């Protein structure tokens, strides 16, 4: 028999940006807990609104499965005499297991006991399971309230717990569980009784609550599509939509209007004012330009929607008026004055001002630009972009709208007559801003972004501010990922070690003990990105710390090894095994010995040497041209000669000349891939 389980945690309003993760974690925790308790169920779902987390388990078994455990004891010959009389060993084993000697089972000449743990009633178990879910739920942040020694994302105000029609009774943080929930906080005053889990959703609908976040999302989109028939295309950005869904319990979309004169402001200013500050969706005309409309979503029904529209229009009008004021004030300040203001902003304690950072960026972009063979005119543009890169940090607009850093730098640069390439680089220096964000698309933007990020990383490492575990307050991992992704995306021939060395040169730290740790950190981020691209872990390990540390070179080598393995896994493993055996033997040699064909005695070593001479130059030529797969495929030619040599030739003979000659040959064979991969890192058993 089975019943449905309904568990609702009613709270004060939770932060919308955290609800999705909490919902996912609650589902995982519930599933794992029920499975650990041996409770069968058909389906587990978790819903949420700003004021509730809802766990709904379909067809949860009324009783645990019984647990059977077989415990192995002493050998039969030790447990029993020849006549079957139990020994002290048998009695001790049975006593330790809580059974009688007669309950012992003899199988395969050993004594066993089968222990059966009867399943408990689910209703009784739930009295501990449900409060346990609250206590164990991982939360990004939590709070205490009243005088309870208990923390949760927000204060708990009610608990609904039903197993079928049975109330699961428990108390937590001064709240007693029961069969009651609450409807919309502004539309329903009285608490609502729920008879059973199936009854819950009807009760919620009558209480103006759409519990299912997916249905709220669909409803908002449907309402927006209706509004679009009147005002034009609505810009629905997915992250904003997700946030709005988690801000409301009963969504009703509406549109409003603002004065067309505000369209003179940069689009990003308008969009930020609407989306970031008011959670409105912008609207665009047929030509893709912003129109003087917005779409908002209220938490409630359509009653008094005109008053709601008017109120929101007034709020946005004030916000846009402020933005226009800040914009106009910023235009009154010259570039030279901005530069002076940067001297007053501390970049990082012990690392000088933001102006000091700008000076470092100017030096870094020169180093990077020269390594990429840029022309003098290009270098001058890069220097100009670096010089202006932080000016917008001291503007009124960025002070009010922090997410517009870079955006306003670009806008003000264009207004001041700077080249578009320079202005775009100022904006692109901050890309990517988060995982999955777009990368810089211009050469100057890529270089400035790399320079800014490597300077940030080296600066913080020099002060001992190094990411550890989940702690990364300065987002250094994200910035390192950005460097690697930019280099790979644009196929820039840049080595991570070069970037590190250049950043150290311009920073001039007193102590350089952090250098190796920072290099390892950068390589670890490269490893993460290779893993995200589907490269096997062992192949990543085999290529990352071999050869130069140009991410493109490393990626090319990794992909070549992956391709070779994928084409013929068995042949690949056999080849690597042979090369590893050759290298292991070669490591027993002392010093560097040249190969002398006159010392060959066996057909197998002559054949191996002949094939080595035949393919060596071609392999090196392909590797030099970075045609790694072609070079590795050529390496397959040595597989059979290597196997024949290792199977039939004794290497460690008494004659030192012959022994060293054979070791030298094996060393040369194993060196064929030394600049491409470390063969010892390849896993041969999976």
Curated annotation (Swiss-Prot):
It is found in: Cytoplasm. Its main location: cytoplasm. It catalyses: tRNA(Gly) + glycine + ATP = glycyl-tRNA(Gly) + AMP + diphosphate. The keyword Repeat does not apply. One of its GO terms (biological process) is glycyl-tRNA aminoacylation. InterPro entries: DALR_anticod-bd (IPR008909), Gly-tRNA-synth_bsu (IPR015944), Gly-tRNA-synth_heterodimer (IPR006194). Its EC number is 6.1.1.14. Keywords: Aminoacyl-tRNA synthetase, ATP-binding, Cytoplasm, Ligase, Nucleotide-binding, Protein biosynthesis. Coiled coil: none annotated. It is an enzyme of class 6 (ligase). GO terms for molecular function: arginine-tRNA ligase activity; ATP binding; glycine-tRNA ligase activity. GO terms for cellular component: cytosol. Tetramer of two alpha and two beta subunits. Belongs to the class-II aminoacyl-tRNA synthetase family. HAMAP family: Gly_tRNA_synth_beta (MF_00255). This is Glycine--tRNA ligase beta subunit. It comes from Halothermothrix orenii (strain H 168 / OCM 544 / DSM 9562). The gene is glyS.
């Amino acid at each position: 028999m089975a019943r449905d389980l309904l568990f609702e945690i009613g709270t004060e309003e939770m932060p919308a940006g955290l609800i999705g993760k909490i919902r996912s974690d609650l589902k995982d925790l519930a599933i794992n807990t029920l499975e650990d308790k041996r409770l069968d169920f058909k389906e587990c779902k978790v819903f949420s609104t700003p004021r509730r987390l809802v766990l709904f388990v379909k067809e949860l078994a009324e009783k645990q499965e019984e647990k059977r455990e077989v415990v192995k004891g002493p050998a039969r010959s030790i447990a029993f005499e020849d006549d079957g009389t139990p020994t002290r060993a048998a009695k001790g084993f049975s006593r330790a297991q809580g059974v009688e000697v007669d309950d012992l089972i003899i199988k395969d000449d050993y004594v066993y006991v089968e222990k059966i743990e009867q399943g408990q009633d689910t209703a009784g178990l739930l009295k501990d399971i449900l409060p346990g879910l609250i206590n164990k739920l991982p939360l990004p942040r939590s709070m205490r309230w009243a005088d309870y020694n208990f923390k949760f994302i927000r204060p708990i105000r009610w608990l609904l717990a039903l197993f079928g029609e049975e109330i699961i009774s428990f108390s937590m943080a001064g709240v007693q569980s029961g069969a009651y929930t609450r409807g919309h906080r502004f539309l329903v005053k009285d608490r609502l009784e729920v008879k059973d889990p199936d009854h819950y959703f009807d009760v919620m609908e009558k209480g103006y609550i759409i519990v299912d976040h997916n249905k709220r999302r669909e409803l908002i989109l449907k309402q927006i599509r209706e509004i679009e028939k009147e005002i034009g295309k609505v810009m629905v950005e997915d992250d904003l939509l997700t946030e709005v869904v988690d801000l409301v319990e009963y969504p009703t979309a509406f549109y409003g209007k603002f004065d067309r004169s505000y369209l003179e402001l940069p689009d990003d200013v308008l969009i930020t004012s609407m989306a970031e500050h008011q959670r409105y969706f912008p609207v665009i005309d047929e030509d893709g330009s912003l129109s003087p409309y917005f779409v908002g979503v209220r938490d409630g029904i359509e009653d008094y929607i005109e008053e709601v529209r008017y109120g929101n229009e007034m709020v946005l009008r004030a916000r846009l008026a402020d933005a226009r004021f800040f914009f106009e004030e910023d235009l009154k300040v010259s570039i030279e004055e901005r530069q002076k203001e940067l001297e007053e902003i501390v970049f990082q304690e012990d690392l000088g001002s933001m102006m000091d950072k700008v000076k470092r960026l100017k030096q870094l972009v020169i180093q990077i630009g020269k390594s990429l063979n840029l022309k003098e005119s290009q270098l001058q543009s890069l220097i100009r972009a670096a010089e202006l890169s932080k000016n917008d940090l001291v503007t009124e607009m960025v002070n009010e709208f922090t997410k517009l850093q870079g955006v306003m730098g670009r806008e003000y640069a264009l207004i001041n007559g700077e080249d578009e390439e320079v202005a775009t680089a100022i904006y692109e220096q901050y890309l990517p801003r988060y995982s999955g964000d777009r990368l810089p698309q211009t050469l100057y933007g890529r270089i400035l972004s790399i320079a800014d990020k490597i300077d940030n990383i080296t600066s913080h490492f020099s002060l001992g501010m190094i990411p550890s575990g989940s702690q990364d307050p300065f987002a250094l991992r994200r910035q390192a990922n950005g460097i690697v992704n930019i280099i790979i995306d644009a196929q820039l021939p840049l080595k991570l070690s070069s970037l590190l060395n250049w950043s150290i040169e311009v920073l001039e730290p007193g102590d350089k003990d952090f250098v190796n740790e920072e290099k390892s950190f950068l390589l670890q981020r490269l490893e993460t990105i290779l893993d995200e691209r589907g490269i096997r872990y062992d192949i990543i390990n085999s290529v990352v710390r071999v050869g130069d540390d140009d991410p493109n070179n490393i990626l090319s080598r990794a992909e070549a090894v992956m391709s070779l393995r994928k084409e013929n896994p068995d042949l690949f493993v056999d080849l690597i095994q042979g090369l590893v055996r050759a290298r292991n033997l070669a490591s027993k040699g002392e010093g560097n010995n040249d190969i002398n064909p006159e010392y060959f005695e066996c057909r197998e070593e002559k054949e191996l040497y002949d094939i080595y001479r035949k393919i060596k130059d071609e392999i090196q030529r392909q590797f030099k041209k970075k045609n790694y797969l072609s070079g590795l495929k050529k390496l397959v030619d040595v597989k059979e000669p290597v196997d024949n040599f290792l199977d039939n030739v004794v290497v460690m003979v008494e004659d030192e000349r012959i022994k060293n000659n054979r070791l030298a040959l094996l060393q040369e064979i194993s060196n064929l891939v030394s600049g491409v991969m470390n063969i010892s890192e390849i896993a041969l058993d999976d």
